[in-house]
UniProtKB/Swiss-Prot annotation:
It comes from Homo sapiens. The lineage of its organism: Eukaryota, Metazoa, Chordata, Craniata, Vertebrata. Ca(2+) 2 binds at D63, D65, N67, E69, E74. A lipid is attached at G2 (N-myristoyl glycine). The record marks M118, N122 as: Interaction with PxVP motif in substrates of the catalytic subunit. It is a lipid-anchor. It holds the Pfam family EF-hand_7. Ca(2+) 3 binds at D100, D102, D104, Y106, E111. Ca(2+) 1 binds at D31, D33, S35, S37, E42. Belongs to the calcineurin regulatory subunit family. GO terms for cellular component: calcineurin complex; cytosol; glutamatergic synapse; hippocampal mossy fiber to CA3 synapse; nucleoplasm; parallel fiber to Purkinje cell synapse; postsynapse; protein serine/threonine phosphatase complex. This is Calcineurin subunit B type 1. Residues 131-136 are annotated as: Calcineurin A binding.
Length: 170
C-alpha cells in the first residue's frame, strides 16, 4: 500500500493517509484468508457487528460491485460514511439504504417489513409488525404514493440526530 494506492482512497473518503494506513492494518487482520477482500464471515468478526441484526444489510451496502465480498476500496468508502468528518446527509443516506433493499430510491411497505423483521425477530407477531409498518408508511408518505422517498425519510428521522450516533473511531 504505497502512496499510489492510498492517494485515490483519500480522494473518495473522509480519511487522511494515516487513517487509511490504520484501516489497512485492520482490514488485513480481518482478511483471514489473505484474499484481498472480506467475506461475510470475516466481516462478522468485527465486534461492533457481531450482535447487529442488520449486518447483512451493512455488507450489502459496502459491497458496491455486488460480488458478495468487500474489497479494501469498498471498505474505506463504507467506513468513511461513519467518519466523524462525514456529513449528516451522507449518514442519513446510508441509513435509508439499509431499508431500500432493491435500490430503487424508495422504501416500500415490504422492504420496511423485512428490515424491521430482522431487528425484532420473533418478538412481535407478523400482524403486529405489519400494523407498525402500515402506520409508519402512512405517517411518513407525504405525497401519497405508498412508499417513502429519501426526502420523506429525512423529514421523519432527520431531527432525531441519529447521524451523531453513526460514528466509528478510526
Amino acid at each position: 500500500m504505497g502512496n499510489e494506492a492510498s492517494y485515490p482512497l483519500e480522494m473518495c473518503s473522509h480519511f487522511d493517509a494515516d487513517e487509511i494506513k490504520r484501516l489497512g492494518k485492520r482490514f488485513k487482520k480481518l482478511d483471514l484468508d489473505n484474499s484481498g477482500s472480506l467475506s461475510v464471515e470475516e466481516f462478522m468478526s468485527l465486534p461492533e457487528l457481531q450482535q447487529n441484526p442488520l449486518v447483512q444489510r451493512v455488507i450489502d451496502i459496502f459491497d458496491t460491485d455486488g460480488n458478495g465480498e468487500v474489497d479494501f476500496k469498498e471498505f474505506i468508502e463504507g467506513v468513511s460514511q461513519f467518519s466523524v468528518k462525514g456529513d449528516k446527509e451522507q449518514k442519513l443516506r446510508f441509513a435509508f439504504r439499509i431499508y431500500d433493499m432493491d435500490k430503487d430510491g424508495y422504501i416500500s411497505n415490504g422492504e420496511l417489513f423485512q428490515v424491521l423483521k430482522m431487528m425484532v425477530g420473533n418478538n412481535l407477531k407478523d400482524t403486529q409488525l405489519q400494523q407498525i409498518v402500515d402506520k409508519t408508511i402512512i405517517n411518513a408518505d407525504k405525497d401519497g404514493d405508498g412508499r417513502i422517498s429519501f426526502e420523506e425519510f429525512c423529514a421523519v428521522v432527520g431531527g432525531l440526530d441519529i447521524h451523531k450516533k453513526m460514528v466509528v473511531d478510526v
